[in-house]
Structure formats: C-alpha cells, structure tokens
C-alpha cells in the first residue's frame, strides 16, 4: 500500500471481508429502521457486522459510527469506503479478489486533510476489473413474469396538492431511455452538488420499477430537493406540470453533465474565426420554440432585458462553466425557450434558400448573418450569400454545445471572464484545429433537438439564420380561422398572419379579453362539431412551423437597415430528439385573470410523421414517432387535477396514473384525453432487429482472445435509442486515451467488457470508438490534477488569510461609517470552498435575493438572509468574484443641538472644579 493510502490510520482496524459477504449484506436491510437499499453502509470494523442506512434515509450508519467509534464503512452499492474520523474516502488493499495491475504512476503529493473527497486524486494504482457483458445486458426480450405482472405500475402518493409532480414523474418514468439509464447505469448518478436530485431520482426509479412492485411510494426526498432549489414549488398551491418537468430535467442535467473536449476536423470553419461583436438588441428576436409565429416588437427593441428577474416560466441555460439555475419568467417563455446551440454545416444556411426566393429574390452580394447566443455575450457570423451555393462545414453539433435548459442563471453577471474573442472573418486565413468546450448529459442526449429559423428583411433582402436547441416544443392551439387558413393553403409552410395562431396569445384590451373569455366559455359548453373541424396535433405543428409575416405592430428590426421593416420568418427542424416532448399551450395568464383553452386536440398513438417539418438538408433518417405518455389537466386555469396516461414498455398496455391509483385503460380512452404534455419516442423496426441480432450473438458467446471495453452509457443508448449514434467511449477515457484519475475509483460503473465478435459487429455497424483493450490511469492527467489542486490549495489559503485579517480589523472599529451586506447563501458557498469542503469556487456574488430597489436606491430586503462586512472586505471579494449589487447600510448620524452640547460641557467643567 502506498504512503498516501496509509495516510488513514484506521485501516488497521478493518476485519477480513469478501465480496460475497458484501453482496449478501447489500440484499438486506438497515438493522435499525429496516429500510432496503440501494446505498446501505456496512461497518468494516473487525468482528462488527452492522449494516445501516445512509443520508438518503435516517443515516443510521453515521449514528453507529459515533456511538461505537467504528470509523470505516463501505457503501454496499458502490463499494467505496469512507472514514468518519478522517472525513474522507480511503482505499483498501484488494481484499475483494485479484485485479489487474496497472503500470506504476507517480504518487500524488499529500493533499490538505480537510479537502473535499471528490477532488482528491485517487491514489490506488489498480483498477477494478469491469464486468463482462452477459445476455441480460443487451437482452431486449420481455420476461414472461414481466408480461404477466409488469413492473412500473406503482403509484405516487399525493403529499399536498402534488398531483402535477406525480403526473410529470410518471410520464418521465415511462420514457425507456431515461429510466433504463438510471436502472442500468445507476452508478453514474453521482454528484457533489446539493441537493443531489439525481440520487433521489435514482432511488425513486428503483422503487417504481422494482420487481416486488409496491402499490405506491412517497416521493418525499425528490420533492424536498426541488423545493430547496426552486421556491416556486414550496407551499401547497397547485403548480404547473410542465414547469416542474423543465425544472427537474434542468437539475438532472446540471448534476449529470460532463465536459467533453473535442478537436475539430482541420477542414471545418470555426465560427469563432468569423465572429464579430454585435450588441444589437433587435437580433434577439428570432425563432422561439414557443411558436414560430410569435414575434413582438417590444422584445425586438428590448432584447437586452431577456435575462432578468422573476422565475415563473422557463428560459435556457446554455452550458459553459456554470452550475446552478432557477426558473424564469412568463414572457421569457414566449420568446426565450431556445438559444443557439450548435452549428452543423454551412450548407444548412442554404436549406431554405429556395423557399425564401418564393417571397423575394436573394441578392448574391448581400450577407446572411448567423447569430449565436451564449450566456456571456452574443456572437454574430456574417456569411456572404453567394457562398451559400457551396456548402462548407461549420463546427459540428458536437463542437459547440451551449445548451437549452429549464431555467436561467441566478443573476445576470454569472459568468465573468467568459467573453471569447471576436475576430473578423479572414477569407484567406489558414484552417487550424481548435478545441471547444461542450457539455452533455443523459438529458441532452435524449431530449435535445435543433431548429433552424430564418428572418428575412423584405426591404434589403438580408436573411438572419439562427440555429437553436430545444428540449420541448410549445405549440399554439389554432382557432377556427387559423385552421381554415392552414387547411386552405396548398403549401404546408405558407404565410400565416403574425400572431394569428391561438388568438388568445395576442395582446388584448380589457373588452376584447372579456369577450374572448365569454366566447371560450360558450365554446366549452357546445359540441365541437358546431364550431368547425377537429384540431389535430398536425394542425398545431403546422401552425408552429408556419411562415410568419412581420409587419404592422410586429415589424422586424433590421440590423442592416437600422429600422423597423416588414419581414418574413419561418423555421424547420434540423435534428429531431430521441424523445420529443410537446407542450400544448392551453393556459393564458393575464395580470388579473387566467384562462384555459379546453379545445380537444386529436393526437396519434403511433406513426406521428414529422417529415413535413424537416429541414431539406437535415441528416435525420427517422422522423416517425410513437406516443409514450401524455399528461392531462382536468379543471380550470385556477384549479384542477393532473393525471398521466402511460404505455408500459414491458407489456405495451396503457395505464392511467392518478396519484397512487394505477388503472389499465383502453387506447380510445387515451385518444379522447385532453392532452397537455405529450412524450413521443422515435420508432424504428430496424433498430429492434439489430438489437435482437446482437443479443443472439452475445448468447452464443464465441471464444475470443481479446476483450473490448465499451461504455455502459452507449450500451444503454443501443438498447433504448432508435438512433444510438457512433460508439462513444469518451465518457470513461481522457483525451490522452487513459482513465482519468477521478474516475478510476468507479470504473466498473462506467464500462463493460465485450467479446471480440460482439465488438466487431457493433463497430462495423455504428463506427466510433476508440477501441479499448486495456485500462490504465492516465499519468498525464494525474500530474495535471496535482498541479490544479496545488493552485486551489494556495488560493484557498490566501483568500482565507486576507478575509480573516480584514474581518478582525472590521471588528475592532467602534462606529464604522458603512456596512456592506452580503448574501449568506453565497458566503456559505465561498466558506465551503476556502475551508476545503467544496472543490470548486463559487460563482459571482449574488445579492439579488437580499436586495430590493426603492426610489432608485438599492436597499436591504427585510428579513433577508444576509451578513455584514466592511467596505474593504467587500472590495476584496468583489475584485475576485465580481457580481453584486452593492447593498450598503449607513448607521444614522445623531445630530446634537449646539446649546445642549455647550450646557453639558459647562456642567462637566463645574463638576471638575468641585
């Protein structure tokens, strides 16, 4: 054992253990509260057989350690060992069976004792041997037991007006790609970020899909975690199921996301090389996934305000280096559902050129502008339209990956120092390789799609093309007049009057609003055939993707003309997601009223064809979808009840999930439902055949001389995706081809071993890679990790010493002239960092929760969770982290009357004389 591993003095107390013993204990229960796993903890003290629950329950394992002074315990799910006395993870000699040795690597320097466990550099020089894939790992056939008594039919108890959450969770639970990830790759649900939503979701999925099939479970842990992050869901009022979905998916993405470094192809044209900074506010008004036909002049003129305050609706979180987020506001939901994520190919800019010319001819000398949004700034790429005839490759959609998420950042100034260089395009500049940061998670892999939208000025013919990532499509429900226009049109993308889709979404006065309210009430009381044809989901999609004339009060602010101009706006899908989430905009919220559109929308259970909405040059091959689940709302806008209809993937039957009640229903019942949110999954019989073929090959188990390591995450895609894409082993490899030191401790959770014949078949079919026959800890990454940790340690020490010195000086002041207030939430994050409890420094100072503006002045919010520091301390912290705003308290100055002061002095003199 190395000196580093021997640093824990309590390892000598470990008794003799075997892997079989731990497996047997993992199938048991906590000896105190009788709760089952996962994540039970077994005491490793010699001759102690105690097994207790962890933090997700009552944490009896910690209580046992405190009472008995037994410091070492092992997690029976991950087999990782924790020492309570040393407050860190420790590594045992291999007592659980022989493991292949790795080449010796330089041992890391000893790290500060109170440093957080996850940024300690794993010092074990061996890796656990990953399991060999067996038939069950790739088996897609349903067991006879599951056909007779299908799993996943467990209800969720209502814990106080939480039907919105229960319906959303059941709908997500019946999305096989996501659920199978947590069931088959549960070891990947690890995070240091609080409140660890991914761990709570893993526990919930394990309970819902357990073979014992309990009648119902209580999602308390998950609900408490979400309420901690998002105050919207606190209390007992009814909330929106779609907002909960977006919040949950965003939190899961944030906790599970991984940064991937990728080198561009040398022939690619990097967007950064042609970027020019453009602060025009009008450029923000492009396609929103809320509706292609929604544009607002006010938002054109006030684009810079799109990252501000409130948290009622959603906006996007484009990933870079940031972590946390909150929900956004109502009007942002209409315009900011998407931001640019990826740039696929310059040929994509040509995709709608022919259809554009139907309205007006393009001038070959004009410029097509591609606008790329990021959280730090805006990027504008100008491409001459005469280049559009020759498609050139821009960075692939794997290279630049700012990503749509469910919520905006905590504050506007959350990303200091993230403004990348803006360079003027050089026509003759040499192509060069370049690295881009990108993030991905199981959420983005499953739910992210891409839309290409264009706005053309009808005066100067300038076309602005925007590529946007969406996680769901919010579709308007067209009215009778809109349906007539859509159905009478011979072209599927013919122009529809701006704002006409769903007249309820246009600005209205009080009288118009009241008349519309009465009209809707009457409509809801009269059979739909009286009012016209039935609205279908295809109608809603057609209305969403319809061309939109920008004129009148809805004119387009042209950057070239520098004026408001008439324009035309349209969009198509460049990349469809594996699971398409569709939200029907049934609710409309005014200042004092809320209304609901109760129009029935007909939707198919199978064979939703999205070919008419696919971009011309899109590489997508599968555009047909089958319904997985649908969330329904019964009632009015102010009150009601949510339920979910879901198709069980094991027996293909439909069930109604109404809180803790689960009932089988017919397909006609589902089709007659008042759909609010729908989940569709790509349909591919070819993918099913390929999975059966590989499963049969694996069952044969031909002897092979070589074993190949493959990513568990990619195998999950192969089992559940219609288009799994190329094999990707980058989730367990570093850029040097080895295993990153941080992942060495749980490599068995990341990979499986395949026989050579299975690897050859998968590789020939899907490509990708790289092929891996040997696992080793990367020496280069280990050295880099040591250097990074050394710098962090020095930074912590410096910041802590300066703060203590400044704070002591502040405490000695008798009557300071000013106090600076600081958010205690941010301060606790900073304190955890400088004390070594958290591996990463906090973001910018965020005083928005403790500040309130009155009469133009920033004041301390009453009852705010804040602390007081000196001006020098504030300047010190602000110079490092930035942020704000400044919240200053000035003690009142007591003005003493001069006559009173003179009288007091006279009395004092007389007293002395006596």
Swiss-Prot record:
Post-translational modification remark: Ubiquitinated via a VHL-dependent pathway for proteasomal degradation.
Record's keyword annotation contains Calcium: no
Comment on protein domains: The UBP-type zinc finger binds 3 zinc ions. However, it does not bind ubiquitin, probably because the conserved Arg in position 55 is replaced by a Glu residue.
GO biological process, one term: endocytosis
Organism: Pongo abelii
EC top class named in words: hydrolase
Keywords linked to the UniProt accession: Cytoplasm, Cytoskeleton, Endocytosis, Hydrolase, Metal-binding, Phosphoprotein, Protease, Repeat, Thiol protease, Ubl conjugation, Ubl conjugation pathway, Zinc, Zinc-finger
Residues reported in the UniProt entry to bind Zn(2+) 2: 30, 33, 53, 60
Gene Ontology molecular function: any one: zinc ion binding
Binding-site positions, Zn(2+) 1: 8, 10, 83, 86
Domain DUSP: 685-778, 786-893
Residue positions binding Zn(2+) 3: 43, 48, 64, 70
A single GO cellular-component term on record: perinuclear region of cytoplasm
Entry's localization field: Cytoplasm, Perinuclear region; Cytoplasm, Cytoskeleton, Microtubule organizing center, Centrosome
Enzyme Commission code(s) on record: 3.4.19.12
Modified residues (Phosphoserine): 345, 407
Residues forming the catalytic site: 163 (nucleophile), 641 (proton acceptor)
Start-end of Basic residues biased regions: 421-437
Family to which this protein belongs: Belongs to the peptidase C19 family. USP20/USP33 subfamily.
Purpose: Deubiquitinating enzyme involved in various processes such as centrosome duplication, cellular migration and beta-2 adrenergic receptor/ADRB2 recycling. Involved in regulation of centrosome duplication by mediating deubiquitination of CCP110 in S and G2/M phase, leading to stabilize CCP110 during the period which centrioles duplicate and elongate. Involved in cell migration via its interaction with intracellular domain of ROBO1, leading to regulate the Slit signaling.
UniProt name for this protein: Ubiquitin carboxyl-terminal hydrolase 33
Gene: USP33
Gene3D superfamilies membership: Cysteine proteinases, DUSP-like, Zinc/RING finger domain, C3HC4 (zinc finger)
Catalysed reactions listed for this entry: Thiol-dependent hydrolysis of ester, thioester, amide, peptide and isopeptide bonds formed by the C-terminal Gly of ubiquitin (a 76-residue protein attached to proteins as an intracellular targeting signal)
InterPro entries the UniProt entry points to: DUSP-like_sf, Papain-like_cys_pep_sf, Pept_C19_DUSP, Peptidase_C19_UCH, Ub_carboxyl-term_hydrolase, USP_CS, USP_dom, Znf_RING/FYVE/PHD
């Amino acid at each position: 054992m190395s000196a580093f591993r021997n640093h824990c003095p309590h390892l000598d107390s470990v008794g003799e253990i075997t892997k079989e013993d731990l497996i047997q204990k993992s199938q048991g229960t906590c000896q105190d509260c009788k709760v089952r796993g996962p994540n039970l903890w077994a005491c490793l003290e010699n001759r102690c057989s105690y097994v207790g629950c962890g933090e997700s329950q009552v944490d009896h394992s910690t209580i046992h350690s405190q009472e008995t002074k037994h410091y070492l315990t092992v997690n029976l799910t991950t087999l990782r060992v924790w020492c309570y006395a040393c407050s860190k993870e420790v590594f045992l000699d291999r007592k659980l069976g022989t493991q292949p040795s790795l080449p010796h690597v330089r041992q890391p320097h000893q790290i500060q004792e109170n440093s957080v466990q996850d940024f300690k550099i794993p010092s074990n020089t061996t890796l656990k041997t990953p399991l060999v894939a067996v038939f069950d790992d790739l088996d897609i056939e349903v067991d006879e037991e599951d056909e007779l008594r299908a799993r996943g039919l467990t209800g969720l108890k209502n814990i106080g007006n939480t039907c919105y959450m229960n319906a959303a969770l059941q709908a997500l639970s019946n999305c096989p790609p996501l659920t199978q990830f947590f069931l088959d790759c549960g070891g990947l649900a690890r995070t240091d970020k609080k409140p660890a939503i991914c761990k709570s979701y893993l526990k919930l999925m394990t309970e819902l899909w357990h073979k014992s099939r309990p009648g119902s479970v209580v999602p308390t842990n998950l609900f408490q975690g979400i309420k901690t992050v998002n105050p919207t869901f606190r209390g007992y009022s009814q909330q929106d199921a779609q907002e909960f979905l977006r919040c949950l998916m965003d939190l899961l993405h944030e906790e599970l996301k991984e940064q991937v470094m990728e080198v561009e192809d040398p022939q690619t044209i990097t967007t950064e090389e042609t970027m020019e900074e453009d602060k025009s506010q009008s450029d923000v008004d492009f396609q929103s996934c809320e509706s292609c036909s929604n544009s607002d002049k006010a938002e054109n003129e006030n684009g810079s305000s799109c990252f501000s305050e409130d948290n009622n609706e959603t906006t996007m979180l484009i990933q870079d280096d940031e972590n946390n987020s909150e929900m956004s506001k109502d009007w942002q939901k209409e315009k900011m559902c998407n931001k640019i994520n990826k740039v696929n190919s310059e040929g994509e800019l040509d995709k709608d050129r022919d259809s554009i010319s139907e309205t007006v001819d393009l001038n070959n000398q004009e410029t097509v502008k591609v606008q790329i949004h990021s959280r730090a700034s805006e990027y504008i790429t100008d491409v001459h339209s005469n280049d559009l005839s020759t498609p050139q490759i821009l960075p692939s959609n794997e290279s630049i990956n700012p990503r749509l998420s469910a919520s905006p950042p905590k504050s506007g100034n959350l990303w200091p120092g993230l403004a990348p260089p803006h360079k003027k395009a050089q026509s003759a500049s040499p192509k060069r390789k370049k690295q881009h940061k990108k993030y991905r998670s199981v959420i983005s892999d499953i739910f992210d799609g891409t839309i290409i939208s264009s706005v053309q000025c009808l005066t100067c013919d300038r076309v602005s093309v925007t590529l946007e990532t969406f996680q769901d499509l919010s579709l308007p429900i067209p009215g009778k007049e809109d349906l007539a226009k859509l159905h009478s049109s011979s072209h599927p993308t013919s122009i529809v009057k701006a704002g006409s889709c769903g007249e309820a979404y246009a600005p209205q006065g009080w009288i118009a609003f009241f008349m519309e309210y009465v009209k809707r009430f009457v409509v809801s009381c009269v059979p739909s055939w009286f009012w016209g044809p039935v609205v279908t989901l295809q109608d809603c999609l057609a209305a969403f993707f319809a061309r939109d004339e920008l004129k009148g009060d809805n004119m387009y602010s042209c950057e070239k003309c520098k004026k408001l101009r008439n324009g035309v706006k349209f969009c198509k899908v460049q990349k469809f997601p594996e699971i398409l989430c569709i939200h029907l905009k049934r609710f409309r919220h005014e200042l004092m009223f809320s209304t609901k559109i109760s129009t029935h929308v007909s939707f198919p259970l199978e064979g939703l064809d999205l070919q008419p909405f696919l971009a011309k040059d899109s590489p997508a091959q599968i555009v047909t979808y089958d319904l997985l689940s649908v969330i329904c709302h019964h009632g009015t806008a102010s009150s009601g009840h949510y339920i979910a209809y879901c198709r069980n993937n094991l027996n293909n039957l439909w069930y109604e999930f109404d809180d803790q009640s689960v009932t089988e229903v017919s397909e006609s019942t589902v089709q007659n439902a008042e759909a609010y949110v729908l989940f569709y999954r790509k349909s591919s019989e070819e993918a099913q055949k390929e999975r059966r073929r590989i499963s049969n090959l694996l069952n044969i188990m031909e002897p092979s001389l070589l074993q190949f390591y493959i990513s568990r995450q990619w195998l999950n895609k192969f089992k559940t995706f219609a288009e799994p894409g190329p094999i990707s082993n980058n989730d367990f490899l570093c850029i040097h081809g080895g295993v990153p030191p941080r992942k060495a401790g749980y490599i068995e959770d990341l990979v499986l071993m395949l026989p050579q014949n299975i690897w050859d078949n998968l590789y020939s079919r899907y490509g990708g890679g790289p092929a891996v026959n040997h696992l080793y800890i990367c020496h280069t990454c280990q050295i880099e990790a040591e250097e990074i940790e050394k710098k962090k340690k020095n930074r912590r020490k410096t910041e802590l010493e300066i703060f203590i010195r400044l704070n002591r000086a502040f405490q000695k002041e008798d009557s300071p002239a000013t106090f600076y207030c600081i958010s205690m939430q941010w301060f606790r994050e900073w304190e955890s960092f400088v004390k070594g409890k958290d591996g990463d420094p906090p973001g910018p100072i965020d005083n928005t929760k403790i500040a309130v503006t009155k009469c133009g002045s920033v004041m301390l919010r009453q009852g705010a969770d804040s602390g007081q520091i000196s001006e020098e301390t504030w300047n010190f912290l602000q110079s490092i982290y930035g942020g704000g705003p400044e919240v200053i308290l000035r003690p009142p100055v007591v003005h003493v009357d001069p006559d009173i002061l003179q009288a007091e002095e006279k009395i004092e003199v007389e007293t002395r004389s006596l």
